[in-house]
Amino acid sequence: MSISMLQDAQTRTLAAALAGIKQEDVHLDRSMSLSPPMSANTSATSAAAIYPAMGLQQAAAASAFGMLSPTQLLAANRQAAAFMAQLPMSTLANTLFPHNPAALFGAWAAQQSLPPQGTHLHSPPASPHSPLSTPLGSGKHPLNSPNSTPQHHEPAKKARKLSVKKEFQTEISMSVNDMYHTSGGPISPPSSGSSPNSTHDGAGGNAGCVGVSKDPSRDKSFTCKICSRSFGYKHVLQNHERTHTGEKPFECPECHKRFTRDHHLKTHMRLHTGEKPYHCSHCDRQFVQVANLRRHLRVHTGERPYTCEICDGKFSDSNQLKSHMLVHNGEKPFECERCHMKFRRRHHLMNHKCGIQSPPTPALSPAMSGDYPVAISAIAIEASTNRFAAMCATYGGSNESVDMEKATPEDDGPLDLSEDGASSVDGHCSNIARRKAQDIRRVFRLPPPQIPHVPSDMPEQTEPEDLSMHSPRSIGSHEQTDDIDLYDLDDAPASYMGHQQH
C-alpha cells in the first residue's frame, strides 16, 4: 500500500514538473533551456501558482491530468516505478517516449552539467534547434536520483571535452588531407621555417607558409647596366661600377695614389709600413697580399692550372699566361716615354735606363728567380738565336741557328783556316742550315718536376688591382693594370726608395 501511494506521489510530482516546464517554455518562446525542478516542493509551488484556488496536491494533480494524455500518464507511472527500483533511465526512454526520447530526461541531464552555486545558472544550448543543452548519455553513467551531487557527474564533463577535442582533431586531419589531395599538383607540407627540404612551390601553394630556401635566380639579383654582370650584394655592384666610371674615392696619404676599394688601400698601406702578414708554411717567405702567398704555394705544389691554347704551355698564374700570350701576338704594351722603347713586361720597363743599351734579358724571370721550375724567357731565346746566327754567318755564311745538341768538345779547339778546313766548316754550316730554330729551345727546357702535392687552404681572391707604390709611366702600362706581376709588390718598398734616389 505504501509503495502504491509513493508511486502516486511520484507520478503527480512528475506531472507537475512537466506542466511547469511546458508553461515556462511558452513564456520564453522556446529561446532558452531551463533547468528541471530541483525537488517536489518547487514543482508543487509552481503548480499552485498556476492554480491558486486549489490546494497544493490538488493543483498538481489537476495540472498533470489536464496536460497529459492517458498514455503519457501510464508512462510516467512506469517511470516512477523504475526510479524506485533503481533502473537505468536509458532502458526505458526509447520505449516510453518514441516520439521524443529526451523530452523527460534531457532536462535532468542538463541539471547534471550545471556549475556549482555562485556561477552561471543555465547551461548553453547544445544546438539552435533544441532548448535542451545536452542529449541523454549512452547509459554508461546511470542516475540514481535527480538530486545527485556534482561530483558524481564530473566524468560526464570530461567525456564531453574529450569528444570536442576528437572532433577538432578530425577536422584538422580532414583539412590537411584535402590540402594534400588538391588537383593543382603536389604541394609540400607546411614547414616551420627550419627545414631546408621544404623548397617546393606548387600551383596552389600555401599562402601562409614562408619560403625557406632562396630562389637560385635571386642569388645574384644586382646587375650592372653596362656589362650585364650580376652580383649578390649591392655594395659589390657599386664597387664594380667604379671600374666603368673611373671613380677612385680612396686615396693614399703617403703617395696620393687612389683606389676604387677601401681594402685595396689597406693592402697598399702595407707597402709603406713594411708589414707582411702572410707567411708561407713551407719556407720563410712573407707576403703583403694573400694572392701572392697563394701564387707562391704553387711553387711548392707544382700546380700549373693555366694552359696556353697555342703552344700548350702551362703557368701557375693567370698574369703569366697573359704575358705569355703577348709573345704569340707580338705585342709590347709597355713603352718608355723618353726613348719610346717597348717591352712586354712591366718590370722590364721599370729596370730600363734611357741612353744606355739594355743588357740581354736574363733567361730566368724575376718572379721565378730562386724557385723551381725555371721559366724560359722568350726574349732570351731570341737573343741567343741571333748570336748563334751571327757566328754561323761569320765562319760559314749561314744565318741558321747552331745545333747545340750535336756539339762536341772538339769544336772548342782552334779553327782550321786552310782550304780543307774551310770546306769542312762550310759543310758543317750547311748541315746546320737544315736545322730549325726550334732546336735551340730544347736545350733550355727542363723535365717537369716530380714534386708531391702539398695541400693548402687559402681564402678567396678578389679581382686584381695595381697596389704598387709607383704610378704608371705610359698609357700602355696604364691599360694593362690587370697584367701586373704581383710579385713585385713584395719588393716595392726597395724599388720605391731606389727611384727616389735617382
From Swiss-Prot:
Listed GO cellular component terms?
nucleus
Main localization, broad class: nucleus
Could you tell me one molecular function GO term of this UniProt entry?
A: zinc ion binding
Annotated zinc fingers (C2H2-type), start-end: 222-244, 250-272, 278-300, 306-328, 334-354
Annotated InterPro entries: Zinc_finger, Znf_C2H2_sf, Znf_C2H2_type
The residue ranges flagged as biased composition, category Low complexity, are: 119-136, 183-198
Gene Ontology BP term (one): regulation of development, heterochronic
PANTHER family in the record: C2H2-TYPE DOMAIN-CONTAINING PROTEIN, PR DOMAIN ZINC FINGER PROTEIN
Give the protein family. Belongs to the krueppel C2H2-type zinc-finger protein family.
Explain the purpose of this protein. Answer: Krueppel is a gap class segmentation protein. It is involved in the segmentation of the embryo and in the differentiation of the Malpighian tubules.
This chain belongs to which protein, by name? Answer: Protein krueppel
Tell me what gene encodes this: Kr
